[in-house]
Amino acid sequence: MPGFDYKFLEKPKRRLLCPLCGKPMREPVQVSTCGHRFCDTCLQEFLSEGVFKCPEDQLPLDYAKIYPDPELEVQVLGLAIRCIHSEEGCRWSGPLRHLQGHLNTCSFNVVPCPNRCPAKLSRRDLPAHLQHDCPKRRLKCEFCGCDFSGEAYESHEGVCPQESVYCENKCGARMMRRLLAQHATSECPKRTQPCAYCTKEFVYDTIQSHQYQCPRLPVPCPNQCGVGTVAREDLPTHLKDSCSTAFVLCPFKESGCKHRCPKLAMGRHVEESVKPHLAMMCALVSRQRQELQELRRELEELSIGSDGVLIWKIGSYGRRLQEAKAKPNLECFSPAFYTHKYGYKLQVSAFLNGNGSGEGTHLSIYIRVLPGAFDNLLEWPFARRVTFSLLDQSDPGLAKPQHVTETFHPDPNWKNFQKPGTWRGSLDESSLGFGYPKFISHQDIRKRNYVRDDAVFIRASVELPRKILS
């Protein structure tokens, strides 16, 4: 072991310190050839590395020239130190040679339990351990008088058959624990008992009142159908599904049949009423079809924009342009949109390969007025300014977009801007609406980024009206 690592009352003199570990020397030895002193253990560890030279002056060493230094050891053992448990509260101080004698009585020193249990604790905590915690201590049960070790007593405590305890059901009775089981099963008025009809358990003195209300209590069928008894909670299901004498509604009641008869007679009614039932179902299907169409129309109306602006994306532009070249006058239609809430209903159409004077060379764009839900509230003819824009998809951070834009005011004398009627809807020349057959040429549309990712964007905006007719 290296030198002593204790708390000294005064700093040890340098000549008492081991040059290798820097601590007061333990079992000091002296090299007689040079006079240097070291801890015996420190010097042995140094020499075990194969260096046979004095650590201080590097002179050759000979094991035969190394001797114990008892005089120096007496000086070291005479140094005054504090107890190794001083930080824990021990106030002892004295010569180093007396430390072991002090530790044999120090109340802070850790010692093994004298009962040979695994515990190791300070000497001052030993009495409490021996009295309360040691698993090897001896204890006697106050109820049965048996002698136990501490660990065995912990298992015995709380289960001793001779201990007097109260009934766990809180009936107030008190008896020895060994009599508790018999009391709980046959004597206690607060014991639980299962119901004879259901799986639930109840306190013994309330079981009778429950049985009169138990949902599994057998009761006779009120229709006297001959099945004997049925559990009370199953009676509604029995009357609905199983009772042969119960009155039931026709299975075609949802279709409109109001016939009601005993269940046994219902089969005959169904066989004899095939045609009336079929007619009812056909009428029901017709009504449902009308309701479905109305719901679809309402859903379409809800999905239509109502802010006077449409941004229409035409994807797969290259393929659709080739189709338009192969099929003259092939027209693409945008989703419908409203000029405003409760406003005019409009739609934009485009001829990717041109129409009229722009056929084969230009993109043509038109707008038409569609029949709307609020036409009777609006001013006619339609006279709001309309603006078309082919959007430049260039990155705004790199260059200012240059949209292609055209604006017009509808001619109030043109019939397509009059209030739509039921005659509208065909794709002849009169239903094209108004627009620009030469909106942009095929050459110009390929400039910049009007076509990007094989798609073009067309924006249509309408001047918002100030009011609707009152």
UniProtKB/Swiss-Prot annotation:
Localization of this protein: Cytoplasm; Nucleus; Cytoplasm, Perinuclear region; Cell junction, Tight junction
**UniProt keyword annotation of Nucleus present:** yes
Which EC numbers does the record give? 2.3.2.27
Q: Which residues form a coiled coil?
A: 277-310
Q: Name one Pfam family in it.
A: zf-C3HC4
Q: In which pathway does it act?
A: Protein degradation; proteasomal ubiquitin-dependent pathway
Query: Where do the zinc-finger regions (RING-type) map?
Result: 18-58
Residues that the record marks as modified (Phosphoserine) are 426
Main subcellular localisation: cytoplasm
Q: Please report the PTM annotation for this entry.
A: Polyubiquitinated, leading to its proteasomal degradation. Ubiquitinated at Lys-263 by the SCF(FBXL2) complex, leading to its degradation by the proteasome.
Entry's InterPro entries?
MATH/TRAF_dom, TNF_rcpt-assoc_TRAF_met, TRAF-like, TRAF1-6_MATH_dom, TRAF4_MATH, Znf_C3HC4_RING-type, Znf_RING, Znf_RING/FYVE/PHD
**Membrane-traversing stretches:** none
Give residue ranges for domain MATH.
307-462
Q: Which reaction does it catalyse?
A: S-ubiquitinyl-[E2 ubiquitin-conjugating enzyme]-L-cysteine + [acceptor protein]-L-lysine = [E2 ubiquitin-conjugating enzyme]-L-cysteine + N(6)-ubiquitinyl-[acceptor protein]-L-lysine
* UniProt GO molecular function: identical protein binding; protein kinase binding; thioesterase binding; transferase activity; tumor necrosis factor receptor binding; ubiquitin protein ligase binding; WW domain binding; zinc ion binding
The family line of this record is:
Belongs to the TNF receptor-associated factor family. B subfamily.
Domain notes per entry: The coiled coil domain mediates homo- and hetero-oligomerization. The MATH/TRAF domain binds to receptor cytoplasmic domains.
Task: Please give the subunit comment from the record.
Answer: Homotrimer. Interacts with LTBR/TNFRSF3, NGFR/TNFRSF16, RPS6KB1 and TGFB1I1. Interacts with SMURF1. Interacts (via TRAF domain) with MAP3K4 (via kinase domain). Interacts with NCF1, TICAM1, IRAK1 and TRAF6, and is probably part of a complex containing TRAF4, NCF1, TICAM1, IRAK1 and TRAF6. Interacts (via MATH domain) with GP6 and GP1BB. Interacts with EGFR (via C-terminal region); this interaction promotes the formation of EGFR asymmetric dimers. Interacts with PKM; this interaction promotes PKM kinase activity.
- In its UniProt entry, what is this protein called? TNF receptor-associated factor 4
Originating gene: Traf4
